[in-house]
Structures are given as structure tokens and as C-alpha cells.
Amino acid sequence: MSTTLGRELLEAARAPEFAGWLRGLRRRIHQHPELAFQEHRTSALVRAELDALGVAYVWPIAQTGVVATVAGAAGPGPVFALRADMDALPIQEMVEWEFKSLEDGKMHACGHDAHVAMLLVAAKLLQSRRDHFNGKVKLVFQPAEGGAGGYHVLKEGVLDDTQTIFAVHVATDLPAGVVGSRPGPFLAGSARFTATITGKGGHAAEPHLAVDPIVAASSAVLSLQQIVARETNPLQGAVVSVTTIKGGEAFNVIPESVTLGGTLRSMTTDGLSYLMNRIREVIEGQAAVNRCTAAVDFMEDKLRPYPATVNDEGMYAHAKAVAESMLGEANVTVSPMCMGAEDFGFYAQRIPAAFFGIGVGSNGNDGGGMAETTKNQLHSPHFVVDEEALPVGAAFHAAVAIEYLNKNASGRSA
């Protein structure tokens, strides 16, 4: 591995002409956030920038996605993929700054604007160094991370020839200039469920003439809590949370039915499948015990469950070594496992993958006139990005790809 490549790429990304372009890209995208599978303006911006760079691409992929290819001129080799998600969230931005969202009720509150901007600058860095690497780099500008867009990209076959894939996500718990991840399970698999428990409505003064679905639903909610407490390994994270419940409209009427729903999470995809099976069994069983019937729906057609994001050990070690060479060992951390979910898990199921957090915690250099150095959570209307992190992410993408391609083209182990 080159001991200087990462630092050279970072220096290039921090150069005034690069850094200004990078900030401008992120701010333009930030002002016009688009929801899942509606990223038409963002997709057009990506294609225009790729055209200007002379980078070939395929479009549309999964409705609004773009997959570009930078081919190394040093000879044949593996295919390495880099991915950035493009969608925003249905949140009203409450940060007052010059480049605030212009779209009512929509905001890039998860940093996907930064992801797209960093990958575009990585494309320029890669294009300018084509003579220095073998193989190909595919740049995946993916729609709808919040709508399983990664699953739909894979279905189209554009990554069938890819040997490995890498992506980053902004991390508010890390300062700019710091990156973090971990080997093995990193982010949880997730799914949602809804259930309808049906009994027999009647007068609340005569419960013996009714079949009460509220009692059945209450028993089901309590029993669901025992799945994690008594059936899962305490060293392997899992969550079952009932977050909605609705039944009845009047004080003196036992309703005909009750609906409830929630989310489930597991640090393994097998664990997620186990939770799904047990949730169905528990709800149906508690309904039957209370003389009711139940219909449980995991909404897999509309809200496809996300597999856990599991970092390939070799790819994690490779990306970590690149980061340490570029930023210094003190600025590369081992992150804890996180119950958040990411559709990058679909890629990691199919292709050896690594997923890293890029610190965007503000040190007063957010670049947008926001001097309050607060650390806001993802999905917050107050979310901000320290733009000093953007060149780090751009250079990290390019360095991870180039180093991997050259190591593997020369026959050495990744």
C-alpha cells in the first residue's frame, strides 16, 4: 500500500478549487432535497457533473439512479464499487443559514447531500489518476436509501461484475477529520410490522357478550417483550418495539378490532428472520388464547426488510489501513455496533463490503454561517454538517478504491 496516496488525494481535495466546488455541490443539493425515488433534480445534477468530467454512466437505474464507471488506464483488473445515496427526508428544516432547504417539508437531515457531493469529487480524483490504477471503479448514485433502493439497484444487474463495494455515512458523534467503523456486524437489520386483532364488538357493560380485542392486544404487546428478554443472545443486539396501537372510539363500546405495529431490529440477518417468525407466532397465539383472530403483516412488498450491514473482515481491514495512512491512527476509531439500519446491507449480503462513518461533528467550521457548534442527531430538523469533513470523504473514497485495485491487480492479498 502506498504510504502517500491517501494524503496526496486529501491534499488535492482540500485545494481551493476542489474544496469550493465540493461545498457548492453539497449546498446546491441541500437546497433542493427530494424524497425516495423522486430524486430527479439530484440525478440530473449528477449526470451533468459526470458529463463535464467525461465519465461514462448508465441511467436510469432503479428509476432515478446513476451508475458511472471510471476505467483505469494501467490495465485490466477487478471492479470496485463506491456508493452514495441521494434521497432526503420529509422533515421541515429549522437551521437558519444561507443554503437552507427551499422545499417545504423536505430536508437533507441524514447527510445524503454530502454523500453525493463527496462521491462526485471522488469521481474527479479518480478520473485525474486513471493512469495510476488497474481495473474499474463503479460509482453508484443510488435512489431511496429509505425505500430499499439498494435492493432495486442490485436487481438491475449493474453490479453483477463487481468484486467489492465501499460506502460512507456522515456521523455526528465523530468530529470532522475522524472516521470509524468495525469488523463484522456494524448496523442492524430492520423490519416493520403491523397486526390487526379481531374479536367481536359489543357493549362495555356486557363484556361477556363480546370478544375483547383490546385484552388480546394488551397480552400480545406484553408477550412480545419477552422475545428479546428471554429468547435472544444478550451479546447479540436485538430490539422489538411496539410503537403504535389503536382500538375503539367510545368509552362504552368494546371495539371489533385493534391494530398495532412497530419495528424490529437485529445485528444479524438470521436474527431478524427469527424475530419476524416469533412476532407472528406470539400475536397469533395471544389472539387465539383470547378467542380472537389475528393478521400479521410485515409489509415486505412495500417496506422490504433491511438485512444487517456486516463488514467483510478483509475489506474492513483494507479501508482501515487506508484511513490510517491518510489521517493517522489517532483519527481512525472502532465504532460500537449501532441499531440504526441501512440499505447498504443489501450490497453487503451479496458483495464483500465495508461501510464507514465520516465524522461531521462541528468544530465551528460548518461553512454555512452556523457558529453554534452543536452536535445534532441524524434526522433532526437542526442537523448540520461541518463541511471540513467533505474533502476527507472524497479522498477516502478514491484512496480505498485505487489501493484495492492496485493490490489485487498485482496479485497481492486485499
Swiss-Prot record:
Single biological process term from Gene Ontology: auxin metabolic process
- Tell me which Pfam families the record gives: M20_dimer, Peptidase_M20
Give the record's keywords alphabetically. Hydrolase, Signal
Looking at the record's lineage, which domain of life comes first? Answer: Eukaryota
Q: What is its EC class? A: hydrolase
Among its keywords, does the record have Signal? yes
Annotated EC:
3.5.1.-
Which GO molecular-function terms appear in the entry?
Answer: IAA-Ala conjugate hydrolase activity
Family of the protein in this entry: Belongs to the peptidase M20 family.
- Reported function: Hydrolyzes certain amino acid conjugates of the plant growth regulator indole-3-acetic acid (IAA).
What protein is this chain from? IAA-amino acid hydrolase ILR1-like 4
Question: Organism source for this protein?
Answer: Oryza sativa subsp. japonica (Rice)
